[in-house]
Amino acid sequence: MPNRSIENLFSGLTVPISAVAEIRRTLAAAESFDDAVELFSFQEFLQNEFPELESIGAALVEKLETGKRFVLLKDLPFADFELPVCKFLVLALATCWGRPRPTYEFSNRLVWEVKPVKDLPPGYVPTVTEHAQDVEPHTDSSFKQHPERYVALFAVRPARSGGLSTIVDGRTILEQIASLGEEASHSALLSSGLFPFRRPTAFTRTRREDQPDWIEAPVVSSLPLVRYRYDVIERGFQCLPDIDTHERRQALKVFRDALTRAPREVVRLAAGDLLLTNNHEILHGRTAFDDGNRLLLRVRMDVDRGLI
């Protein structure tokens, strides 16, 4: 492997004309993007068009597990193509370091468009990927029994201003809590107690506010190390008022205060940039923005590398 950083190895990546042609043929033969994905042989595609990516992908996984727990890849050429082709290329790349998983259990959608959604039904509460407000650092898929280990965010159209990615290492949050000693007497509940995580309405089967779905899980465990999303827990307490106790509220406050104090990195994604995170150990968020055209693509991946 050349003597340069893993991130920079992707900066010279080119997309062969033959690769784009194959993707377009597959899309034309399918009724939908998701159906096209099911028809496509990603393994053969990568071996033929991007044979160098397998070894680079393995090196990236090692960095996610032993380094800073996130990697920023710059200037990928995927955003130069029409959106369906761009989504295909991002998905193909994602298979190099994990197994892409559906956005929710009863769907085959592997690529989620992160963009402000207009004309929402009355009373519908948008999830964080559907609005433009500030988003506190959180765990992706916190409301799933088994959150995916890796999350990739690819910038197709970044916001003109705002919309910056914020990253906090979960290990530093736990170190801060441990340093408090008796001042954080309720913090043991973060690992020994169960907290309610309500599934966002966008990811429920009925997509109705009056038919909620939730799980109960600890905030701190061995796998994932941290599971946290404040708005999801808050709405979970509304579903399970019997466990909305003073002790749980105090434990949650200890965690949230430590999150506020913890160092955070701020990343500005330009068009073509991809942020890859270890979702079990870091929290990621976003600053507010006012550009309705902002578009990111998200792919969640399990730890086992493989193809769809």
Where do the PLM segments sit?
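Active-site environment of non-heme Fe oxygenases that use a 2-His-1-carboxylate facial triad
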Residues: 1-53, 58-59, 65-71, 79-80, ...
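Short secondary-structure capping/junction motifs at helix and strand boundaries
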Residues: 98-109
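Non-catalytic, well-ordered alpha-helical scaffold segments
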Residues: 87, 91, 147-150
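A short alpha->loop->secondary-structure connector
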Residues: 90-100
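Short glycine-centered, acidic/aromatic-flanked micro-motifs in structured strand/loop junctions
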Residues: 75
